[in-house]
UniProtKB/Swiss-Prot annotation:
It comes from Pediococcus pentosaceus (strain ATCC 25745 / CCUG 21536 / LMG 10740 / 183-1w). The chain crosses the membrane at residues 15-35, 39-59, 158-178, 197-217. Its cofactor is Zn(2+). The lineage of its organism: Bacteria, Bacillati, Bacillota, Bacilli, Lactobacillales. This is Protease HtpX homolog. InterPro entries: HtpX_protease (IPR050083), Pept_M48_protease_HtpX (IPR022919), Peptidase_M48 (IPR001915).
């Protein structure tokens, strides 16, 4: 079952890559049509921006994400306990030892990033080291190592890169509008007026709703991966109580100060403790109570 899920995640990586790429091009076309009077110019601009973001994130995702979250790489001598826990969990999961980072934040939390198990990294906050015991830390690290083993981190990296590209496209379009750009037509350019209006409306709606749809899709992927990582952590530690108690402590902690908003979905729990939405569409994580209930049934 687990190996089937890993294979499924690899396929999802391809699907997400294709889907996001298509969405980027459509939004680029809409931005070009509305603000520059040329859908093709928008598509070219979108392709260039997306390619740059993808290259940056895939080639240097660990450094980029760790930098955004103010994380510092450590050695075994700096924090031997957490270092050895990461080492042990990686050994059990049969993956290379990830790099280990520390985020100087009193709120307990952790995340994993990278492009593949060969260049992955795990980050923990100072707060999680102070508040969790060894069994609870093993549950948390087992969860993060599972993200690495299941190739969730690659999916996250691609989604984050292309979401950033979409945000940049919309930003460019809006700045162009405020700086005096925008679509202009001559008074005698009235041929196909009805079609022109329809295309303009569709383009504007796409520019407005495209980033929202992207966010919803990205967060849905994140929520589904959390359940799998929880289950995989128990497979590694053989101790569901460790992760249960860790989640309980994390759920009642204060919001983080050092977390980057665009990386929120990477963390084991929402670092900003935002109020849950009615339909959970904009939640970065599934409810902790639901995760605990699933763990209790194992």
């Amino acid at each position: 079952m687990l190996y089937q899920q890993i294979a499924s995640n690899k396929r999802k990586t391809v699907y997400v890559m294709i889907g996001f790429a298509i969405l980027v091009l459509f939004i680029g076309a809409a931005v070009g049509y509305v603000f520059y009077d040329s859908a093709m110019a928008g598509i070219i601009m979108a392709a260039v921006i997306a390619a740059i973001y993808m290259a940056m994130m895939i080639a240097n995702s660990t450094n980029v994400v760790m930098g955004m979250n103010h994380a510092t790489e450590i050695s075994e001598a700096d924090h031997p306990e957490i270092w050895h826990i990461v080492e042990d969990m990686a050994l059990v999961a049969n993956i290379p030892m990830p790099k280990v980072y520390i985020v100087n934040d009193a709120s307990p939390n952790a995340f994993a990033t990278g492009n593949s198990p060969k260049n992955a990294a795990v980050a923990v906050t100072t707060g999680i080291l102070e508040r969790l015991n060894r069994e609870e830390l093993e549950g948390v690290i087992g969860h993060e190592v599972s993200h690495i083993r299941n190739y969730d981190i690659r999916l996250s990296t691609i989604a984050l890169a292309l979401s950033s590209a979409i945000a940049m496209l919309v930003n460019i379009g809006m700045r162009s509008f405020w700086w005096g750009g925008g679509r202009r037509r001559n008074d005698n350019d009235n041929e196909g007026g009805s079609l022109e209006i329809v295309m303009m409306i569709i383009s504007i709606v796409l520019v407005i709703l495209g980033p929202i749809a992207t966010t919803i899709a990205q967060l849905a992927l994140s929520r589904n991966r959390e359940y799998l990582a929880d289950a995989s952590s128990v497979e590694l530690t053989r101790n569901p109580l460790g992760l249960i108690h860790a989640l309980q402590k994390i759920s009642v902690s204060e919001p983080m100060k050092e977390a980057d908003p665009s990386s929120a979905a990477l963390y084991i729990s929402d670092p900003f403790k935002k109020k849950r939405t009615m339909a959970h569409l904009f939640d970065t994580h599934p409810p902790i109570e639901d995760r605990i209930q699933r763990l209790e049934r194992m």
